[in-house]
Swiss-Prot record:
Residues 55-97 have a biased composition (Gly residues). Residues 54-95 are annotated as: 5 X 8 AA tandem repeats of P-H-G-G-G-W-G-Q. This is Major prion protein. A lipid is attached at A233 (GPI-anchor amidated alanine). It comes from Cervus elaphus nelsoni (Rocky Mountain elk). It is found in: Cell membrane; Golgi apparatus. Glycans are attached at N184, N200. Sequence repeats lie at residues 54-62, 63-70, 71-78, 79-86, 87-95. Cu(2+) 2 binds at H72, G73, G74. The normal, monomeric form has a mainly alpha-helical structure. The disease-associated, protease-resistant form forms amyloid fibrils containing a cross-beta spine, formed by a steric zipper of superposed beta-strands. Disease mutations may favor intermolecular contacts via short beta strands, and may thereby trigger oligomerization. Residues 28-110 are annotated as: Disordered. It is linked to PrP is found in high quaPntity in the brain of humans and animals infected with the degenerative neurological diseases kuru, Creutzfeldt-Jakob disease (CJD), Gerstmann-Straussler syndrome (GSS), scrapie, bovine spongiform encephalopathy (BSE), transmissible mink encephalopathy (TME), etc. Residues 1-24 form the signal peptide. InterPro entries: Prion, Prion/Doppel_b-ribbon_dom_sf, Prion/Doppel_prot_b-ribbon_dom, Prion_copper_b_octapeptide, Prion_N.
Length: 256
């Protein structure tokens, strides 16, 4: 009795294994496949509609009949039938055929106006014996003590300079010498430059110009002095023994 049961189970297992091998050896019929009665992948002839509707009959992900990832029938990654990476056919890698070269950035053109402007702002003026040109400032509102001069200044202030020439503050002993030199060179340079253009200055213009430039030179001195002391403080801080020791220890930890 036991032997008959064992024989029955062996027969059932044998039939099941044989059926499984037979199913594995069968080839899939054309048009049949996973979850559909059509192709192997979804989206190619599914009776219930495509999840990703095709655009011209190709493999999965082929909107126009090319290989995988070929929207217009080229090789892999060829959207319009050229070589790999050719968007519109023809040419070697990175060549766009009828279009410009693909993914090749154009060479930037140098703007000479920007170069000249960057060189002029804060640069050393060689023709003025090493003076530097400060940044542009708003012309100060100054009262000269009478209505005529106040009105004259408001009407002609655009003719006066809005930048000053100066040397580094460490070349002067105090603010007065800096301002005196700054006023002289700025007024002289502006007067000469403007006169060559056919415009003359009266004594009133020179008087007002000196007052305006003096205020701007004081402002320039304050800016330069603050920047100079900040640079000096940074140098002193990083040159102190505790800071040097700390930096050396950190470098040792990073390298080690």
């Amino acid at each position: 009795m036991v032997k008959s049961h064992i024989g029955s189970w062996i027969l059932v297992l044998f039939v099941a294994m044989w059926s499984d091998v037979g199913l594995c050896k069968k080839r899939p019929k054309p048009g049949g496949g996973w979850n559909t009665g059509g192709s192997r992948y979804p989206g190619q002839g599914s009776p219930g509609g495509n999840r990703y509707p095709p655009q011209g009959g190709g493999g999965w992900g082929q909107p126009h009949g090319g290989g995988w990832g070929q929207p217009h029938g080229g090789g892999w990654g060829q959207p319009h039938g050229g070589g790999w990476g050719q968007p519109h056919g023809g040419g070697g890698w990175g060549q766009g055929g009828t279009h410009s070269q693909w993914n090749k950035p154009s060479k930037p053109k140098t703007n000479m106006k920007h170069v000249a402007g960057a060189a002029a702002a804060g640069a050393v003026v060689g023709g003025l014996g090493g003076y530097m040109l400060g940044s542009a400032m708003s012309r100060p509102l100054i009262h000269f003590g009478n209505d005529y001069e106040d009105r004259y200044y408001r009407e002609n202030m655009y003719r006066y300079p809005n930048q000053v020439y100066y040397r580094p503050v460490d070349q002067y002993n105090n603010q007065n010498t800096f301002v005196h030199d700054c006023v002289n060179i700025t007024v002289k340079q502006h007067t000469v430059t403007t006169t060559t253009k056919g415009e003359n200055f009266t004594e009133t213009d020179i008087k007002m110009m000196e007052r305006v430039v003096e205020q701007m030179c004081i402002t320039q001195y304050q800016r330069e002095s603050e920047a100079y002391y900040q640079r000096g403080a940074s140098v002193i801080l990083f040159s102190s023994p505790p800071v040097i020791l700390l930096i050396s220890f950190l470098i040792f930890l990073i390298v080690g």
